[in-house]
Amino acid sequence: MNTTILIHDDDIQVNDLKENKTFLLLSEHNERIIDKLCSCLLPIIFYCDYITSPDDEGTLETRILSSSYMIRDKYVNVEEFITAGLPLSWCVNLPEKAHSTASDSLIIRDVLYYKKDWIRILLIQCPSAIYTDEELLIDPFKLPRHPPELFKNVTLRSYVNGLLFYPTSSPLYALLSHVVTTFIIKHITCVTKHDEKLITTCYDKGRFNAFVYAWYNSQISDDVVENEKVKNLFALVKARI
């Protein structure tokens, strides 16, 4: 999956909307960015907003907030719109103003719009961190479940990190693969000003463990005293991850 990082919100241009793309939003102005982008996609547009949050086991529980069309009081999602043959009569409701993201949830806007061809855009609002210790991202499941806000916040942000560095094992990637089965998206643009570490540093526990074991094996020698120091340091590091 190709990834681009934009450090300044104003760098997003209409040209960024000419191919199927995911925007991963870690900005202080996510709602403004979404409203600005969607205004460029009118008038032929179909959208669906989802909200998702992890349960105590880390499983993402997802529901639809709104969409362009309803049938029998049930929101139609983008895949259903495509399966129905892209009926323009279903492009009834224009996208709502972007929802604000709580610290324990993530909002996804799935958009299909037409300008010479159908193009699909995903806009993912990532919650801001409510923690200060970045090491929590390595294994969120060590955290207590009550109160739930911290566990959910760290878990969601670790899933976002996983989407960029080890997507096939990220629950967020699995969710997006379920949401998007046609008009496949292979490019992610990350938009942030103050959250670069989440999208530039890999926090995968498996990779940390592999690195630690490789380091440990490379340090062991015939020196018994030094080996004891290495073992103690290894145990200390292992306890933290």
From Swiss-Prot:
Keywords: Late protein, Virion. Late protein which is part of a large complex required for early virion morphogenesis. This complex participates in the formation of virosomes and the incorporation of virosomal contents into nascent immature virions. GO terms for cellular component: virion component. Induction: Expressed in the late phase of the viral replicative cycle. InterPro entries: Poxvirus_D3. Coiled coil: none annotated. Belongs to the chordopoxvirinae D3 family. Signal peptide: none annotated. It is found in: Virion. Pfam families: Pox_D3. Its main location: virion. This is Core protein D3 homolog.
